């Protein structure tokens, strides 16, 4: 990732939101990038993530994969803001968000879809989306317009009056993504998007992610379903023992002997 690598080298030393005015001088260099550099995390003296750097560009899907206990979930949660960073920086469009809580990152355009069902169970499908629109859009006319557009875009208009709790796994994911887009994010962080989804709905989730990238949204995915994820992403980072083992396209990942030996297995095929 040559361009992102050059950006990473320029981000060193920037630590806090008050530096924003200086960042605006070269904001164009960082626009459309989410870049983490040197992420490190330790628990009780044991380092679980060691100087991990990664990047996501607008309009691409990037996987963050690795075996259980490798540190990928901790790394992912540092990017979302769920886990504080011990060392390293996270920048969104050139703004340092390393010490910001999740809700402030959301204001800068980062959406997050957790593994667990996050629908408002007591609301209808349309009111799940409307609840977010009422926060971000003052005009009722615009709220109604955006609501109809999202229901149509994700093919759930026929379910608008249905209780959200009655949806299937695939329908629920479509609603959750539609609701996340109501806040107009530039990046989406997807935690185990294939978890709890019937096999028949896997292709539906893959199409939803492709739809996000076509919208120009950068997507970072972590998932244990490696075959489904590699069949979807533009690039992937493989984490092993808290460090980046390999970065590249799905073909590069599958062909790498160390990745096959330590993670995928010798018989793995896409």
Language model: regions and residue ranges:
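Conserved ABC ATPase "signature" region
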Residues: 95, 130, 141-159, 206-210
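Conserved catalytic motifs of ABC-family nucleotide-binding domains
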Residues: 184
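Conserved ABC ATPase signature
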Residues: 163-167, 171
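The feature captures the beta-strand-to-loop junction immediately N-terminal to the Walker
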Residues: 65-67
